[in-house]
């Protein structure tokens, strides 16, 4: 940096990287927009822009000087109480973007027409960005709150490091609690869902306190049930929390609620269990301080008739009475509820409060559990999948966040497979990784024994709670089953940590063995998608949203693509592996994304045919009947340590298909294309290319010591930038849990006008000779789970290329056969999409 420069110079090293100490100018108007940087060594670009636009509100200004800035925060909120007629069909949510020019930080309002940049995770924290058109907007409900609006922007690449020490130009942006730029009473939401508490409005400071009961009248729940209709004032309740639900956000535009939240507590005394509803601003005040097992004294509450459509969780104790005719309501006002946490040491035997009881089951017991049963599990995490999202309703802006995990408890070769939805515990949900003690309560059993492979997994409910730390002293540590499992976990070694996996594409739940069974669970109008509609499906997906569709076509070509890297016998931080060549979309991404207010997404910015692809897996024939293979990754087939002195003795069969007869086909080594494809491929109306496998799609072997980096890679993009600790490794430096490469499969539409390339990655373990016994392409795609067992298998180890040759031949046998392909599609963000062939059906 030159000390003679009046303005920060453009370039990748500029954005937010000024490290000199700068004193704030104290001459600004309190809460005002303009604060002049009189004594700054470097002139603030943000200051210059603000001075240029404040006199012309709502007028777009094209900037004569565009310099790179860094993005420090992207925050979402509902615009609750401002006119929404300025934009036709305005979006439900708005975004504030905090930028830094190296001198000042500024919180800016993103024009709603650019919201899709956040939906697609193109505009995200940590990147370099150039803003070329802006406007000024005043919040008339706040003094001096002029807002810098972003109307045209170019999103660049992530920066290695950004200084977070620069001050805000506008002191109002530093106020606590942090409030959005627009709306008088709005608050920030979690970036990717509405269930997680986010921001500094959520308190954690409520502690148990000694209470003098001398002048306090207490009523039992059963007595209250009989008399509440005739009462105006209610005596205090002394209860224990047995269940706590996740948060429900019910905010809507033009509803003037300060914090529109709701949560349920199931509480009990000696006479029964009842639902308690905590409303609105009381949730940020108390939610994070309340936990299952606490004793509460509730005063100044209200009582109402229970909501008829809500299903209460059953008491764990079958002798406990379930009170379902009334609900206890807690509010910050009308009346203002008084809540006291009573310390456990003050508990008196005459209160007869129920103890906290768990319903732990072992993995060996799960096979006999009926569908929809509720249970608790404890064990060790052996697989932690990436965070994904699904729409709550079609055409909705609201999403569920979830991830797939495997839990082992030593009672079975198979793990618990759990679909873990967000439980309003982001501090847990975002910090789980393999080899962690894991407790999850109130899980529901999902099963279908008539399906092949059998469907059996657990899913969270509204009352599920997760614990990964603070186990000591918890009531469940005295449970007989839990104690045995805890002892088993203590015997696990670091060596076994090598058999754990994190992240990547996870093809679960499996689809049924026939298309007729598959179609029973799909709405008729959305059962089949034309290949020409696939592009639109992909464009409509938001960040980490996954969708499963079915297409019809003909397999006309297949190509085997082995991994082009080798796993070295070194720590992940020292293991450098060559990544696959970037797709066209990745190359385009490096040039950045340019977008302006009111413009539609340009063709160059769509996640189109050049986007990368995801892996699809199959399983070994010997486990087709069950969904629960032990989640153990396999070593890299090309590892120098493995290959040296251990070359396979089985002759390669990759050329065994070269003399195939029958239909017209050409098979050369590791690829095949049909005569139909040679005739049609140059006259297609459209060809969608999704054959690339992105590094994020590949499950990685978990390595202790790198848990923070790996966890961050497979979590959702954060709302605020956190500087890295030292120089972080790269994801493709971590060894893949796959040993066989992937296949690029070309499917031609039935009308021979459009084709699509998709990725298919079969299950393969070089330790297991049975994986080479692939009879047909169809058999290979009848998988059960992601990872093969760890049990050693005697016999010769087949060459991966020999297995690939079998799969190529199996695909060739389907020449000109009309098939139905089940595709899993996921938006990975930043114009990267994975499309995976999960299953193929032939006409029944």
Curated annotation (Swiss-Prot):
Residues 228-331 bind DNA. It holds the Pfam family RADX. The keyword Lipoprotein does not apply. Keywords: Chromosome, DNA-binding. Residues 590-608 have a biased composition (Basic and acidic residues). The keyword Transit peptide does not apply. This is RPA-related protein RADX. The lineage of its organism: Eukaryota, Metazoa, Chordata, Craniata, Vertebrata. The gene is Radx.
């Amino acid at each position: 940096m030159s000390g003679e420069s009046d303005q920060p110079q453009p370039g990748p090293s500029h954005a937010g990287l000024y490290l000199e100490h700068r004193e704030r100018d104290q001459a600004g108007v309190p809460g005002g927009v303009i604060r002049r940087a009189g004594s700054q060594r470097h002139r603030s670009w943000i200051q210059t822009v603000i001075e240029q636009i404040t006199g012309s509100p709502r007028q777009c200004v094209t900037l004569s000087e565009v310099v790179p800035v860094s993005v420090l925060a992207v925050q979402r909120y509902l615009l609750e109480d401002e006119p929404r007629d300025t934009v036709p069909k305005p979006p439900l949510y708005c975004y504030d973007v905090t930028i830094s020019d190296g001198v000042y930080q500024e919180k800016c309002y993103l024009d709603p027409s650019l919201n899709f940049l956040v939906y697609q995770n193109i505009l995200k924290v940590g990147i370099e960005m150039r803003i070329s058109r802006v406007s000024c907007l005043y919040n008339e409900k706040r003094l001096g709150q002029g807002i810098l609006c972003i109307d045209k922007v170019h999103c660049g690449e992530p920066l290695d490091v950004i200084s977070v020490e620069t001050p805000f130009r506008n002191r109002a942006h530093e106020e606590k609690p942090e409030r959005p730029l627009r709306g008088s009473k709005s608050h920030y939401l979690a970036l990717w869902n509405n269930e997680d508490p986010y921001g500094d409005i959520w308190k954690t400071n409520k502690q148990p306190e000694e209470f003098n009961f001398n002048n306090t009248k207490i009523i039992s729940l059963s007595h209250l049930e009989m008399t509440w209709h005739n009462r105006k004032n209610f005596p205090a309740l002394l209860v224990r929390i047995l269940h706590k639900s996740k948060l429900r956000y019910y905010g809507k535009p033009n509803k003037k609620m300060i914090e529109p939240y709701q949560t349920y507590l199931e509480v009990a005394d000696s006479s029964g269990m009842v639902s308690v509803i905590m409303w609105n601003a009381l949730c940020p005040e108390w939610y994070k301080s309340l936990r299952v097992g606490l004793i509460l004294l509730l005063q100044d509450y209200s009582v109402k008739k229970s909501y008829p459509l809500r299903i209460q969780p059953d008491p764990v104790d079958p002798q406990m009475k379930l009170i379902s005719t009334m609900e206890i309501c807690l509010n910050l006002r009308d009346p203002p509820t008084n809540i006291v946490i009573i310390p456990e040491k003050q508990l008196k035997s005459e209160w007869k409060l129920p103890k906290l009881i768990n319903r732990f089951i072992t993995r060996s017991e799960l096979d006999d559990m009926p569908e929809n049963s509720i249970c608790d599990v404890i064990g060790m995490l052996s697989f932690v999948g990436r965070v994904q999202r699904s729409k709550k309703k079609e055409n909705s802006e609201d999403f569920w966040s979830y991830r797939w995990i495997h839990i082992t408890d030593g009672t079975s070769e198979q793990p618990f497979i759990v679909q873990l939805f967000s439980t309003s515990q982001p501090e847990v949900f975002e910090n789980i990784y393999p080899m962690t003690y894991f407790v999850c309560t109130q899980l529901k059993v999902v099963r279908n024994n008539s399906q092949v492979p059998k469907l059996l997994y657990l899913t969270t409910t509204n009352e599920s709670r997760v614990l990964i730390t603070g186990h000591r002293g918890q009531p469940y540590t005295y449970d007989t089953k839990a104690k045995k499992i805890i002892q088993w976990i203590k015997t696990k070694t670091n060596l076994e940590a090598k058999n754990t996996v994190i992240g990547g594409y996870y093809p679960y739940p499996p689809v049924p063995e026939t298309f007729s069974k598959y179609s029973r669970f799909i709405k008729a109008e959305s059962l089949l998608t034309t290949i020409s509609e696939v592009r639109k499906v992909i464009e409509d997906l938001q960040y980490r949203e996954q969708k499963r569709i079915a297409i019809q076509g003909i397999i006309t070509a297949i190509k085997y693509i082995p991994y082009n890297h080798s796993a070295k016998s070194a720590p992940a931080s020292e293991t450098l592996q060559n990544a696959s060549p970037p797709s066209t979309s990745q190359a385009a991404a490096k040039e950045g994304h340019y977008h302006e207010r009111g413009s539609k997404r340009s063709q160059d910015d769509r996640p189109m045919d050049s986007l990368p692809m995801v892996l699809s897996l199959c399983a070994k024939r010997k486990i087709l009947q069950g969904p629960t293979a032990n989640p153990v990754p396999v070593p890299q087939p090309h590892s120098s340590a493995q290959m040296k002195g251990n070359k396979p003795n089985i002759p390669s069969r990759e050329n065994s298909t070269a003399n195939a007869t029958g239909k017209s086909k050409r098979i050369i080594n590791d690829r095949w294309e049909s005569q139909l494809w040679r005739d049609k491929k140059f006259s297609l109306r459209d060809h969608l290319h999704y054959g690339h496998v992105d590094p994020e799609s590949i499950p990685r072997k978990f390595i202790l010591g790198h848990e923070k980096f790996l966890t961050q890679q497979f979590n959702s993009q954060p709302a605020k930038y956190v500087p890295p600790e030292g120089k972080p490794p790269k994801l493709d430096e971590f060894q893949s849990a796959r040993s066989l490469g992937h296949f690029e499969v070309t499917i031609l539409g039935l009308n021979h006008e459009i084709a699509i390339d998709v990725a298919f990655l079969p299950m393969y373990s070089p330790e297991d000779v049975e994986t080479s016994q692939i009879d047909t392409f169809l058999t290979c795609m009848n998988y059960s789970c992601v990872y093969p067992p760890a049990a050693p298998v005697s016999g010769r180890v087949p060459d991966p290329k020999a297995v690939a040759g079998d799969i190529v031949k199996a695909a060739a046998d389907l020449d000109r056969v009309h098939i139905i392909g089940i595709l899993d599609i996921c938006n990975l963000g930043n114009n990267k999409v994975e499309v995976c062939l999960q299953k193929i059906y032939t006409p029944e």
